[in-house]
Regions:
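Conserved P-loop NTPase motor core
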Residues: 1-582, 631-632, 649, 653
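Short alpha-helical segment immediately N-terminal to, or the first helix within
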Residues: 91, 839-840
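ATP-binding Walker
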Residues: 104, 845-846
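Extended, charged helical/alpha-beta scaffold domains that provide interaction surfaces
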Residues: 326-334, 340-348, 549-550, 557, ...
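Short, Lys/Glu-rich amphipathic helical modules
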Residues: 448-462, 639-640, 692-696, 840
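Membrane-interface amphipathic helices and adjacent TM-edge segments
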Residues: 468-470, 835-838
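Processing junctions and N-termini across compartments
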Residues: 833-835, 844-845
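Cysteine-centered loop/knuckle micro-motif
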Residues: 841, 848-852
């Protein structure tokens, strides 16, 4: 492959060569654009829109539109797009991923495709990873768009629905991936069309696309409501988990033992597979659980909840670690983001894992939540007509972007050559020796005034290192808490000479680290990685914090044989070999085998994580098809379409299904079980029971026809009871919405239960995914049949007394990815009306006797 690349150039080089003529065209237009007055430049927007209406395509407009934005940026921001930024802008317009190194001005690049695509008037979403960046970019880059006459909006966590709707109506909207996803889910829970906030998903430009579409894609977005379940089972399972004994992982059985047929006895009550983060009970463990709960068989369907909860308790004790995965603060368990190391208030693990950790830590166990709506980022972003992304690191995950999102990655060359030195990893035997070496390196760099950024993986590691530096008297700043506006300032100051900053993973990503002159002459920013991350991409992101725009700098990773990566994925034989060499304390080990082993371990984990995400997507695909059907049906109701034909079809379907269920095709009418037919049909459609004399000598189809005619007449009689025809049409919509929402929410829960129990199918030599699909489709069919029955039953039994109003089926209590910013308090616009005041709507009655009645 490498030889072919040398002969023909890499994929990226070939693609860039192909778009260079466009770049030349944009460059040629520069003098013309500079000659225009501000008003003439602004007038270009109107001109382009008119040309689009006359049939010109966006691709034909691209050179002029990009030249316009380039000139506007020069006038407004005093920043002019470099050639490489123009290349990036073209790649983004084509719906691809532009890999641009840190400091190459990705934010400015996005203005080009955002402007061009906004000309169509269908809206453009610029998606960022947090509220701070969304607000900063909207205020900063928004100036260019506003200068050119476009409206720019920004959606923040604190906005109300009305404010969100207004921001989404703008030509270009800056928003975080979580807010956008949750707004989509909330839009599919509203009960009036006027409550919708989003417009159609037309074009998205995703900043830090690897973070959004890959790192965060392992957890779906979930909107939850309160569940009625008790929390006692979590506490009981926690008590039992503490008494259970951990056994040896069967994976440690060598290949030779397997070939020789050596039988390894199961040990302990449960086995933990740290690589895949799975806990399994042994036979002894199953017996212990059955004895503890006084049950006969743990595998019985009615014991599924106990089985699920004991596994959760064991996971909480053996795979979830305090100060690494979560922290305990103010009697609450708060999650730590594994990618940024930030605390995330308001976010909770789903499936009851959060409750299991609360029981483990002896804090108040909160009621489990019920999922009201959910979607994965993969399925959500694939709804956009066109999407593009930019990041500093995407090539290592190109296969995933191609397979799942249909996007290829084009590496954009840097504006100036990279001057950063990436040094060989330093490997030590123990963690203690490694930390000693890191402190030494920081002390040496600090002595000559070179700024240092130390990247850690966990909060615990950053605090440990901070203590060691404090003992050495090195002044430093630590960044590991939740994102706050100070963070960007601390990160920006990390390039000042003599600065020492310790930060978890990607804290402050999106903020440039600029060097002062003294720091530049001291060798630029020195990056120290205290551990290799599971993903090479995140290591590359840390390296990329240094050496922006041709600045000097260096990066080096320090590793010990005790690190999780080496312990879990390094080969036992290699670690044993280094231990046997008797290397003296604090001696750095340099060996080609080690560097290769680290690279191999990371590739193993990356493909493992890709597998997890692909698996999640395959399972979610089943739900996605069902979600599309339900959401489309809801939208028809919201759009105010007449549901009369839908209801008539439901009535005839119920008659068909009931007759088919009770009456055999070839049975004579004298053999029909009328008692059963009436007992099934009459509770739903209140007809006169069918009598024997009505049907003598009848065929099955004639029976169906007779019942359908009676049922339709019954419904027409119900319609006649309503003085206004629109009243029954609205009643149909109210009942349909209520039934669909109730059944869909229960269905999400049922599918969740099915998913948790489906793994057991593997023991029966069945493919769990195939079984899940089959069972899922059966459950969906059953749900749609239930929707039909409940809707028809409610409509035919309803009494006309008062005007019906729509109401939401469940109250939303939270989401699993809440941003930490609180909602702004709602201010009352008009004066408060008290019960004894006259009604403000002019009825002449007191308010409490008129509109104030509940």
């Amino acid at each position: 492959m490498k030889i072919l690349d040398k002969m023909f150039g890499t994929h990226s080089e070939r693609e860039i060569k192909r778009i260079m003529p466009l770049v030349e065209q944009i460059e040629k237009l520069k003098p013309d654009m500079m000659a225009l007055s501000d008003d003439e430049l602004r007038g270009k927007t109107k001109e382009y829109r008119e040309r689009l209406e006359q049939g010109t395509t966006l691709d034909e407009l691209l050179p002029e539109a990009y030249a316009t934005v380039r000139e506007a940026a020069r006038r407004v921001l005093n920043m002019e797009h470099y050639r490489v930024q123009l290349i990036g802008g073209i790649i983004l317009h084509q719906g691809r991923i532009a890999e641009m190194k840190t400091g190459e001005g990705k934010t400015l690049v996005s203005t080009l495709p955002a402007y061009l695509n906004a000309l169509e008037g269908k809206g453009v979403h610029v998606v960022t990873v947090n509220d701070y960046l969304a607000k900063r970019d909207a205020e900063w880059m928004g100036q260019v768009h506003e200068f050119l006459g476009l409206k720019v909006g920004v959606v923040l966590n604190s906005l109300t629905s009305e404010e969100r709707r207004e921001q989404y109506q703008c030509d270009i909207t800056y928003v975080t991936n979580n807010e956008l996803g949750f707004d989509y889910l909330r839009d599919n829970m509203v009960i009036y069309k006027e409550q919708l906030v989003l417009r159609d998903l037309h074009y998205a430009i995703i900043d830090e696309v690897d973070s959004v579409l890959i790192d965060e894609a392992r957890t779906p977005l979930i909107i939850s409501g309160q569940s009625g379940k008790s929390t006692k089972l979590y506490e009981a399972c926690d008590i039992l988990a503490r008494q259970m004994e951990r056994g040896e992982d069967m994976e440690d059985l060598s290949k030779m033992d397997a070939i020789m047929g050596v039988v390894q006895e199961e040990t302990g009550d449960f086995i933990v597979n740290e690589k895949d983060k799975i806990v399994n009970l042994t036979e002894r463990g199953v017996a212990k659980v059955e004895q503890f709960f006084h049950i006969d068989n743990l595998a019985d369907p009615e014991n599924l909840e106990i089985q699920h909860n004991i596994i959760l308790a064991l996971r909480a004790h053996n795979l979830m670690f305090r100060d690494q995965d979560y922290v305990v603060k103010d009697d609450q368990v708060l999650i730590v983001d594994e990618f940024t190391g930030r605390i995330m208030p308001g976010r909770r693990y789903s499936d009851g894992l959060h409750q299991a950790i609360e029981a483990k830590e002896h804090v108040k166990v909160k009621r489990e939540s019920k999922t009201l709506a959910t979607i994965t980022f993969q399925n959500f972003f694939n709804k956009f007509g066109k999407k593009a992304g930019m990041t500093g690191t995407a090539l290592t995950e190109e296969k995933e972007f191609r397979d799942i999102y249909g996007m290829d990655v084009v590496e954009i060359p840097t504006n100036r050559p990279i001057a950063r030195k990436d040094l060989q990893d330093a490997v030590y035997k123990t963690k203690k020796e490694k930390l000693h070496a890191i402190v030494e390196a920081v002390v040496q760099a600090h002595a000559k005034g070179q700024p240092v950024l130390v990247g850690t993986i966990t909060i615990e590691a950053s605090e440990e290192l901070s203590n060691l530096l404090r003992k050495q008297g090195i002044p430093h700043k630590v960044l590991n808490a939740k994102f706050h506006e100070m963070e960007a300032e601390i990160v920006a100051d990390a390039g000042v000479h003599g600065a020492v900053t310790i930060a978890t993973n990607m804290a402050g990503r999106g903020t440039d680290i600029k060097l002062d002159d003294a720091a530049r002459s001291a060798g630029g920013l020195k990056i120290i990685g205290t551990e290799r991350h599971e993903s090479r991409r995140i290591d590359n992101q840390l390296r990329g914090r240094s050496g922006r725009q041709g600045d000097p700098g260096e990066s080096k990773f320090y590793i010990s044989l005790e690190d999780d990566l080496m312990r879990l994925f390094g080969s036992e034989r290699m670690i044993g070999m280094f231990n046997a060499l008797g290397i003296p304390e604090n001696q750095e080990i340099e060996h080609k085998t080690l560097s290769n082993a680290i690279e191999t371990a990371q590739k193993k984990i990356e493909s493992n994580n890709f597998g997890i995400r692909k698996n999640l997507l395959e399972y979610d695909q089943v739900m996605n098809e069902q979600r599309e059907i339900i959401y489309a049906e809801r939208r028809r109701v919201l759009d105010g379409e007449s549901m009369r034909d839908v209801i008539y079809k439901m009535i005839t379907d119920i008659v068909d299904n009931t007759v088919d269920m009770v009456v055999a095709d070839d049975a004579d009418s004298s053999e029909w079980d009328l008692k059963e037919l009436n007992s099934v049909l009459v509770p739903i459609i209140p007809l006169e029971p069918v009598k024997k004399d009505e049907i003598s000598g009848m065929k099955k189809n004639s029976l169906k026809q007779l019942l359908k005619e009676k049922a339709v007449k019954l419904y027409e009689a119900k319609e006649a009871q309503f003085p206004e025809p629109e009243a029954i049409r609205e009643l149909e919509r109210v009942i349909l919405l209520k039934v669909i929402d109730k059944k869909w929410m229960d269905h999400i829960d049922d599918m969740d239960q099915l998913r948790q129990g489906i793994g057991l199918q593997a023991y029966g030599q069945k493919d769990p995914l195939v079984e899940y699909k089959m069972s899922g489709y059966e459950m969906f069919d059953s749900m749609t049949a239930n929707i039909q029955e409940d809707t028809v039953k409610l409509l035919l039994h309803v009494r006309v007394e008062q005007k019906v109003e729509r109401e939401q089926v469940a109250k939303v209590t939270g989401t699993n990815k809440d941003d930490s910013v609180g909602k702004a308090p709602v201010k009352r616009e008009e004066a408060k009306v008290y019960p004894n005041d006259p009604c403000p709507y002019g009825s002449g009655k007191k308010y409490k006797q008129c509109c104030g009645r509940k």
